[in-house]
Amino acid sequence: MKELIIGSHVSFQRKTQLVGSVKEAVSYRANTFMFYTGAPQNTARYPIDDKLTQEGYQLMEENGIDPVDVVVHAPYIINLANTAKPDNHRFAIQFLREEMDRCAKLGMTRLVLHPGSHVSQTREEGIQNIIDGLNQVLTTEESTYICLETMAGKGTEIGNLDELKQIIEGVEHSEYLKVCIDTCHLNDAGYDMTKFDDFLNEFDEKIGIDRIGCVHVNDSKNVCGAHKDRHENIGLGTLGFDTLYKIVTHPKLKDVPKILETPYVTKEDNAKEKVYPPYRFEIDMFRNGKYDPELLEHIRDFYK
């Protein structure tokens, strides 16, 4: 059986860039990772350093990480779904194009994008706005796929399977579109993750299973259909370890990178500040196929 392709969100810092990202991923015993090329919540971007990129690739090769499996996440501030302020929509299109170019410079082939929220406009208008935006971004020759993320349906978010199907069908160069399925978002949107084969069948029927380009692996703090989007550590939420393990090891997804975006852990139960990354331990649980009931204690002991 092919080795599990699993990693987590890691940082991408100005001074170390890809080198720092790879080192962090390796410290979690991961064989893939996901990063933002700058801050997710603003437009500040610094130039990609070719030397650091080259060193990062060397480190990946030394540590068994295939660059094809590495994922970039587009910043949250890109909202293609709303055109109430045309300047903002034009900016979102331009900024997404720049992110695609940064991915190309880094040699990254997967860019995850939140489809957006229609806000004051109708859902249908929002979907059409996304289609129009993607048609302006995507050209005939891209080296990076945009992976549209399944969303929880919070507020006016767009991103259930029917909406993603409509977007993909409306985009001219849809050969460059894939989907990132997020287990927490799907649960919160009302899809039953305990019946994952049924979900995959529905996905295959509506979109095509070959379009799955990434899996965000998160437990959820909420019940199915809550439309909330609050991630929880693996095994501590409403989905549970067994359900997530079946998804992560599903044979139809064996070639798809799995990325953890679970919350950092506090120093003690009642503390508020989350300081310890859980990923090394959550990855180990999935590799071993066994839930650790003392997960939080082991994370705290390791980092303190």
Annotated model-derived regions:
Residues 22-29, 49-71, 97-107, 135-142, ...:
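Acidic (Asp/Glu)-rich catalytic clusters
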Residues 13, 259-277, 302-303:
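A short, acidic, flexible beta-alpha connecting loop/helix-capping segment that sits on the rim
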Residues 4-10, 31-35, 68-74, 111-113, ...:
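Hydrophobic faces of well-ordered beta-strands that scaffold small-molecule active sites
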Residues 1-72, 80-98, 289-304:
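N-terminal pre-domain/capping segments
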Residues 9-13, 38-40, 75-77, 116-118, ...:
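Active-site beta-loop-alpha junctions enriched in small/polar residues
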Residues 86-98, 123-136, 160-170, 197-201, ...:
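Short, electropositive alpha-helical surface patch
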Residues 131-234:
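Acidic/histidine-rich catalytic cores of soluble enzymes
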Residues 16, 61, 79-178:
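Active-site acidic/histidine proton-transfer and metal-coordination neighborhood
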